[in-house]
Amino acid sequence: MKKGLLIVLSGPSGVGKGTVRKKVFKDESLNLVYSISMTTRLPRNSEKDGVDYFFVSTDKFLQLAKEDKFLEFTHFVGNYYGTPREYVEKLRNEGKNVFLEIEIEGAKEVLSKCKGKDVISIFLVPPSLEELERRIRGRKSEPDNIIQERLAKAQREIGYKDNYDYVVVNDNLSRASYRIKQIIRKRMKMLEMADEER
């Protein structure tokens, strides 16, 4: 069985990563599976454990980190976020294309460890910083000081976009998700052709 792709989607907080991912996942021909991150933060109202994130205590998270059980992990706004290593490898070995939706710091770590034609990195950017602020405030899930911290970090993170294979502007949900689907299909086809040549 052919090993699946690893697709890394990053972008600043509030850019719409989750919304775009959900739209991309509607295309079953891509054989995508979402890699669920582990976090110590509290769930938002609509989030479910084991679906949106694996929610754990800080003690549990730090124990797993000490045992090198994460492909990557990072600390952001008082909480830890990480990608369980064994979970991702199991899915890829089953031939599934694993989709990571992670913060930039975590993506840097993953991309330093995972290289090759079966890894795709995509950076999602907002059409403007003003639009990004509107989206974050529209969540109504965080106090103003956290929003300001997220916006300041977003400005720094956007400067990192050129380190990714692709940059996609999320100015329109359909257009952004279509572009990401094209990127994935192109890489799948390229790897199929390389396999046929062997």
Where on the chain are the PLM-derived regions?
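Short, well-ordered alpha-helical microsegments
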Residues: 17, 106-108, 176-177
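Short aromatic/basic micro-patch
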Residues: 54-56, 82, 101, 167
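Phosphate-binding P-loop
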Residues: 1-4
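NTP-dependent small-molecule kinase module
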Residues: 138-142, 156-198
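Short hydrophobic/aromatic beta-strand immediately N-terminal to the Walker A/P-loop
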Residues: 6-10
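N-terminal phosphate/diphosphate-binding loop that engages ATP/GTP or pyrophosphate donors
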Residues: 18, 22-69
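ATP-dependent NMP and nucleoside kinases share a basic, alpha-helical "lid"
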Residues: 60-69, 83-140, 184
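Conserved glycine(s) of the Walker
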Residues: 11, 16
